[in-house]
């Protein structure tokens, strides 16, 4: 590990183990969240402020779900960085029926320490609350660090008497059943699929592409360039988009940034992507999509929720000719552009959360 990496790791450790916990224990002068004790509340937390619109879509959809399914509760949003300084105030203003919902995503495990350690802080601190972990992907690496982090997670998760875990894929579901045996575990799709942006009329033109360029991509740079060249030769100019936009996004700007991206997708004739939320955004906007598998199980298993949608097609071996053929197939196929049938998976979820249905 380089000296720069060591410095970054140490700075993050100080933040998570010293600065943020001290804000909780000492109390912060500026309480960012106000809540009334006479009103029952759902605390929605672990909310992001980085540049990944996939995570922001999860936060946006989670709030939409709670507002629709829990109209009798106030929804109190708490950003990940603010939960430490807000926790005591929220507990002091507790209503007996208050609950905590933690947004889902792909940050459960040892890869994203900030998110995982904050999740554990929430579970420990709100020990006497009903705590619901919304659909997540878990990955603890088979390393000394990964095994150590898993052991800590098991201790904290299993000690909470009212923790409900949701897995958004089969691999995570089996992992949770094996390692968090004392918890109730549900399998649910990514919360973004609760949304529907397929009804807006749109003139569609052109093929769009959104491919990863990091360690999660199954494509090497040369392969990625060959795929793009083949698409350009077949369809002309290929427009690119990304779900990581290079600027921080807040609760105030979240909806604007998401709607801008969804509007762009609604203007596409077809999309080629290897990003989980690139695929999911196509499903909710009714946009034909060719899905290229990623390095891990995340996209492959996420596709299982969408495989019956006629305008979605998975390519496991992404040779350029296969990709262009799949795009042509979708462009010439007459299919309904209805979005994801959310009622199939989300109807009755409130009863499952309360333990009244299985």
Curated annotation (Swiss-Prot):
GO terms for biological process: polysaccharide biosynthetic process. GO terms for molecular function: transferase activity. It is an enzyme of class 2 (transferase). Induction: Repressed by SinR. InterPro entries: Polysacch_pyruvyl_Trfase. The keyword Signal does not apply. It holds the Pfam family PS_pyruv_trans. Its EC number is 2.-.-.-. Belongs to the polysaccharide pyruvyl transferase family. May be involved in the production of the exopolysaccharide (EPS) component of the extracellular matrix during biofilm formation. EPS is responsible for the adhesion of chains of cells into bundles. This is Putative pyruvyl transferase EpsI. The lineage of its organism: Bacteria, Bacillati, Bacillota, Bacilli, Bacillales.
